[in-house]
Amino acid sequence: MEAYLKKLCFEYQVEEKEVKELLARMERVYLDKGETIASATMPEQSLYIIVSGILHTFTTQQGEDKTVRFLSEGDAILCYNTSKHSVKTLTRCVAYY
């Protein structure tokens, strides 16, 4: 099993078969370094499952970015329009969307 699948199954307590069924319904996307996939101002609802790369989740307070967490292979990001966080790629990334 690929590393991102192992981590995803372990972290979210789901079976590999269930994850593969979900991934079959999703599109594999390639993201460039510096790409914003979610922000407090983006009216989008989406789910990303990270296959490779590093992403930065942050919030902006008083004009300064404050790190919330870093994401990598096997992490999932649920982006929704009421989020106060932004997510930006720090490296080239591959994800399911």
Regions found by a protein language model. Give the residues of each.
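Glycine- and acidic-residue-biased ligand/ion/polar-headgroup-sensing regions
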Residues: 34, 45-56, 73-75
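Short phosphate-coordinating micro-motif centered on Lys-Gly-acidic
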Residues: 37-42
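A short beta-strand-loop-beta hairpin characteristic of the jelly-roll/cupin
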Residues: 55-66
